[in-house]
């Protein structure tokens, strides 16, 4: 019989400062918290929380995703967070409010959405 593979338990890093990356699309919201070097500490998304289809794109789903991430980050000792927001989705403001309500102190909010210099033609809803 094969031996059981021994795996190390995940070590909780003590990271007091971090960066919250909120990526919102028309279909989903992904919230990732990294340390200052860009190494992921924790992440969550509306889809990972069990929302399916059009419910993933709601502000409520984004709020729950941000709450889950904030709780996990605070377990790692995180207190202050800088926020980078990407994308045009409906969960932008809800995610920021949720991070703040969960107890993380937001030091800066930056919108880093990539704007094309007239690149590809977007799909039909954003064109209108």
Curated annotation (Swiss-Prot):
One of its GO terms (molecular function) is structural constituent of ribosome. One of its GO terms (biological process) is translation. SUPFAM superfamilies: Translational machinery components. InterPro entries: Ribosomal_uS11, Ribosomal_uS11_bac-type, Ribosomal_uS11_sf. Keywords: Ribonucleoprotein, Ribosomal protein, RNA-binding, rRNA-binding. It holds the Pfam family Ribosomal_S11. GO terms for cellular component: ribonucleoprotein complex; ribosome. Belongs to the universal ribosomal protein uS11 family. Located on the platform of the 30S subunit, it bridges several disparate RNA helices of the 16S rRNA. Forms part of the Shine-Dalgarno cleft in the 70S ribosome. NCBIfam families: PRK05309.1, uS11_bact. Part of the 30S ribosomal subunit. Interacts with proteins S7 and S18. Binds to IF-3. This is Small ribosomal subunit protein uS11. The gene is rpsK.
